[in-house]
Amino acid sequence: MKKFILFLLKIVVLLFAVAVVLDVVYTIVYVNSDSRSKIDYLYNSSDKEYDVVFLGSSRVNNHFVPELFEKEGYKTFNFGITRSRLEETALQLKMMVERNYKIKNIILQVDLNINTNDHSEAIRSLFMPYLHQSETIRAHYKDIPEYNKLLLIPFYRFMYYDARIGFREMYYSAIGKKTNVLENKGFNPLANKPGPMIPADLTKYYPKRNVAYEDRKSVV
């Protein structure tokens, strides 16, 4: 019985050691990658100066063209991310402050997102590789239910968000495979023709107090 318990303890210790090693390896890869997403680009940049910065979801990502502003002499970047909510754009703005960005004008997309305090799991996952390195990210997520697990259990955050920051994404980051998200200064036009407009009655909607929106105003 003692031998069996000792064997189990060895297995647990081995698994813990493997998790620690994997956590370190994945983290090193991500903190040295700046060409896969707008979040890793933001994390690995500092002291940027812009005349105009766009923040928001696909409505920003697919529609605001920095080149048009650049032609008028305004240094511009589109930090919009498809599927992001106000919570994620608030954290982007905080990271810009943390990275000592100097921005003259910020255009924030609000629209119907003001009516929900929800978040995007897909976009939240993109911040997780830097949870240990960024005090700003830790402070932003300290109240979410899974925070302690994500912070304290080795490799847990990479397993929890495997679909977005798992092995495949880590491998592409390690070999320096770029995506197109940073092309055109962050502007990503829709490739296909837009479908028909969907009729919607917006009269039932009205602005509500949004925690992330208030958070963004306090940063600005």
Predicted regions and their residues:
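Membrane-embedded segments
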Residues: 55, 59-147
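Acidic/glycine-enriched edge-of-secondary-structure segments
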Residues: 22-29, 75-83, 204-214
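Alpha-helical transmembrane signal-anchor/signal-peptide segments
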Residues: 27-49
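Soluble or luminal CAZymes and related metallo-dependent hydrolases
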Residues: 34, 85-88, 215-216
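N-terminal hydrophobic targeting signals that begin at the initiator methionine
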Residues: 1-2
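Hydrophobic membrane-insertion alpha-helices, especially the h-region
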Residues: 6-26
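Secreted/periplasmic serine-hydrolase-like ester/acetyl group-modifying domain
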Residues: 123-220
